[in-house]
A protein has these predicted regions:
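Short, surface-exposed amphipathic charged segments that create phosphate/polyanion-binding patches used
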Residues: 34-45
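Acidic/histidine-rich catalytic cores and adjacent linkers
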Residues: 2-19, 23, 27-31, 49-195
Length: 195
């Protein structure tokens, strides 16, 4: 079973499905890292006194959160590198984010474990408190994160379906007919999936 980093979910699965294998989806680990990186960026922006540096820090949010391998535009890559060179904690956090994603690209579970252990060590050495706290969460869920190598499952499709349902709920806001909502749900999924 694939889940996020919620203690309630992992506890419920362990309690009610004791024989089920539990995998923490890599999307959720990456999302947590992106949230911490953005929070750090905002903290650094508030602490920065130089107005020009503040503008640079504020203007690179989407570049920080984007997959580094997907930044092909020279101007964007240059802008990111310039911003990172101005702020060491932000640079460290950014490269830790990129390193974290490599856990799921390893050829074996053992290599992924070694990389994850090294990542946690680097985070602790960085002394960036937001990330140190996250590292303790990663350490607590390490078994479930690495379980991906045994089961290779993700909850991406379910997350996508949930997102489509949320969008549909916003689109038909004000309709009071539950039967109509149910029909729209079936029509929404009829094209791609059979429920």
């Amino acid at each position: 079973m694939c889940t996020d980093l919620s203690a309630a979910y992992t506890r419920a699965v362990s309690e009610h499905l004791p024989n089920a294998a539990l995998v923490v989806g890599h999307f959720h680990v990456t999302k947590l890292m992106n949230e911490k990186l953005d929070l750090l960026r905002r903290q650094l922006w508030h602490e920065e006194k130089d107005i020009n540096k503040r503008k640079v820090i504020k203007g690179i949010r989407w570049l920080l959160l984007k997959n580094g391998n997907d930044i092909f535009d020279y101007a964007h890559r240059n802008r990111l590198e310039n911003a990172l060179s101005l702020n060491r904690p932000l640079m460290i956090a950014y490269y830790l984010k990129e390193d974290l994603k490599e856990i799921w690209n390893q050829c074996s579970k053992q290599k992924a474990k070694d990389l994850l252990d090294e990542w946690v060590k680097q985070v602790i050495e960085s002394k960036i408190q937001l990330l140190v706290k996250m590292a303790s969460t990663i350490r607590a869920y390490k078994t479930y994160i690495l379980a991906w190598y045994d089961h290779c499952i993700t909850n991406g499709k379910i997350e996508g379906i949930n997102n489509k349902i949320k969008v549909l709920k916003r689109q038909i806001y004000g309709f009071r007919n539950e039967e109509y909502f149910t029909l729209r749900l079936y029509a929404l999924h009829d094209r791609h999936l059979r429920i």
